[in-house]
Amino acid sequence: MDKELAEKVEKRRTFAIISHPDAGKTTITEQMLLFGGVIRKAGTVKARKTGNFATSDWMEIEKKRGISVTSSVMQFEYKGKRINILDTPGHQDFSEDTYRTLMAVDSAVMVIDSAKGIEPQTKKLFKVVKQRGIPIFTFMNKLDRDGRPPLDLIAELEDLLGIEGVAMNWPIGSGQTLKGLYDIANNRVELYRKDGEDRFLPLNDDGTLPDSEALSQDPQFKDTLDEIELIKEAGNKFNREKIAMGDQTPVFFGSALTNFGVETFLNSFVDLAPAPESHTVNEDEELSPEDPEFSGFVFKIQANMNPNHRDRIAFVRIGSGEFKKGLDVTLARTGKPIRLNNATEFMSSERVQVSDAVAGDIVGLYDTGNFQIGDSIYSGKRKIVYPALPEFTPELFMRVTAKNVMKQKSFHKGMNQLVQEGAIQLYRNYQTDEYILGAVGQLQFEVFQFRMKNEYNSEVEMNSIGHRVARWIDPEQLDPQMSNSRNLLVKDRYGNPLFLFENEFAERFFRDKYPDIKLTEKL
């Protein structure tokens, strides 16, 4: 084993942040970047009029609407560790991008609005993380506002998500009466100060404050002591093994907006989160991150991160070995050799040329059309193929045409590049070859329309076709005569045939009429 490579890999902490929209995910990301020294000022997503946009929201539509619609990658050094943050869209219409991103991380941070508790999108994303069996860390956000009782929030983790919650700190008040946090893990009190200055009070051996501290006589602090005693007696016991397996989540309270409790959370996270671990490749082989042969997989493709160059970047999670500039790799899907001369690291849309990266890191490769989402690349003679990434079956479909027939070239270029990102699916009518777009949610169409105009100067006309159910069919079983007014025969961008049904009733009618025909769907 290469000792130097092993030491580099051990320093990596690669994680995604998941939440329901508006729980504060992007804000806590910015505060972490502040502690990492990569930005000097956090811009809140609400501050669109001031121009203080969130660092992770780099796309033009994100700045205009104050939402994240694409996963961002940010990297920085912190306390001797290399931190790779993947900030994901919270909006449910972009869950496919988020799901794929979750395949590229070693742990996850779940941000919950303490006034609302666990919300639908958080629940969906948690299931994906849970299936992967990776550690999950919970940040109960917005403590500076009135919220639900902390004991209820902890109980909800087990009731709704089926995961043990173990409190690492505990609120002393909330909202207007917030006094601070009782730091169980570090045996101290972190006082709440609106100026953002840290002030910590050490606790006595018995967990109380010295009598000389005014807070020791505060009724809220005494209530907190009662709750702490209850937690220690009846609550879940901290267990590193359970955390590593994803069966227990350390819970931290705080306020990302006022930067309260974030540094304490980050310090604990860096200590508890895992370094990169082995991947299953070639269906049943374990591949160590310290394996000397480089390998990785493409989990995201992004067009126009630099609108001036109209480029495409393939995001690669390195699974093993070390990347060096000029590395020769093989694209597993085609067997094509590729030399990796230009690779970048990220601070959202900002890029830095990288000459060295190891397992756990995320690098961006300039893509001239070689890569597809889910592709595996490897440097040695041994072929390495990572597991397939999840694909979703769209539920909304629209016909799309260029408003200006004289701009067909930019229309087709924009269409092809945005579809290759995987956030929207492209189909073509089997008979007429007209374009049909498929998406999980309406917002994806709006973003597509905006980006076509903004990035490709191509205005598009979009009309709903009213079909909601997509099912693939074996080409050998296909008879075009099966198509009628209630099921539209189309082909996906790989040429595979499928039917778009009006609704589930139309699908059932088809299945009853053709019982020997096998129809399949994606996620």
Swiss-Prot record:
<dbReference type="InterPro" id="IPR041732">
    <property type="entry name" value="RF3_GTP-bd"/>
</dbReference>
<dbReference type="Pfam" id="PF00009">
    <property type="entry name" value="GTP_EFTU"/>
</dbReference>
<dbReference type="GO" id="GO:0003924">
    <property type="term" value="F:GTPase activity"/>
</dbReference>
<dbReference type="InterPro" id="IPR031157">
    <property type="entry name" value="G_TR_CS"/>
</dbReference>
<keyword id="KW-0963">Cytoplasm</keyword>
<dbReference type="InterPro" id="IPR053905">
    <property type="entry name" value="EF-G-like_DII"/>
</dbReference>
<feature type="domain" description="tr-type G">
    <location>
        <begin position="10"/>
        <end position="277"/>
    </location>
</feature>
<comment type="function">
    <text>Increases the formation of ribosomal termination complexes and stimulates activities of RF-1 and RF-2. It binds guanine nucleotides and has strong preference for UGA stop codons. It may interact directly with the ribosome. The stimulation of RF-1 and RF-2 is significantly reduced by GTP and GDP, but not by GMP.</text>
</comment>
<dbReference type="Pfam" id="PF16658">
    <property type="entry name" value="RF3_C"/>
</dbReference>
<dbReference type="GO" id="GO:0016150">
    <property type="term" value="F:translation release factor activity, codon nonspecific"/>
</dbReference>
<keyword id="KW-0342">GTP-binding</keyword>
<dbReference type="GO" id="GO:0006449">
    <property type="term" value="P:regulation of translational termination"/>
</dbReference>
<comment type="similarity">
    <text>Belongs to the TRAFAC class translation factor GTPase superfamily. Classic translation factor GTPase family. PrfC subfamily.</text>
</comment>
<dbReference type="GO" id="GO:0005525">
    <property type="term" value="F:GTP binding"/>
</dbReference>
<dbReference type="InterPro" id="IPR000795">
    <property type="entry name" value="T_Tr_GTP-bd_dom"/>
</dbReference>
<dbReference type="InterPro" id="IPR004548">
    <property type="entry name" value="PrfC"/>
</dbReference>
<dbReference type="InterPro" id="IPR027417">
    <property type="entry name" value="P-loop_NTPase"/>
</dbReference>
<feature type="binding site">
    <location>
        <begin position="19"/>
        <end position="26"/>
    </location>
    <ligand>
        <name>GTP</name>
    </ligand>
</feature>
<feature type="binding site">
    <location>
        <begin position="141"/>
        <end position="144"/>
    </location>
    <ligand>
        <name>GTP</name>
    </ligand>
</feature>
<dbReference type="Pfam" id="PF22042">
    <property type="entry name" value="EF-G_D2"/>
</dbReference>
<dbReference type="InterPro" id="IPR005225">
    <property type="entry name" value="Small_GTP-bd"/>
</dbReference>
<keyword id="KW-0648">Protein biosynthesis</keyword>
<dbReference type="InterPro" id="IPR038467">
    <property type="entry name" value="RF3_dom_3_sf"/>
</dbReference>
<feature type="binding site">
    <location>
        <begin position="87"/>
        <end position="91"/>
    </location>
    <ligand>
        <name>GTP</name>
    </ligand>
</feature>
<dbReference type="InterPro" id="IPR035647">
    <property type="entry name" value="EFG_III/V"/>
</dbReference>
<dbReference type="GO" id="GO:0016149">
    <property type="term" value="F:translation release factor activity, codon specific"/>
</dbReference>
<dbReference type="InterPro" id="IPR009000">
    <property type="entry name" value="Transl_B-barrel_sf"/>
</dbReference>
<protein>
    <recommendedName>
        <fullName>Peptide chain release factor 3</fullName>
    </recommendedName>
</protein>
<keyword id="KW-0547">Nucleotide-binding</keyword>
<dbReference type="InterPro" id="IPR032090">
    <property type="entry name" value="RF3_C"/>
</dbReference>
<dbReference type="GO" id="GO:0005829">
    <property type="term" value="C:cytosol"/>
</dbReference>
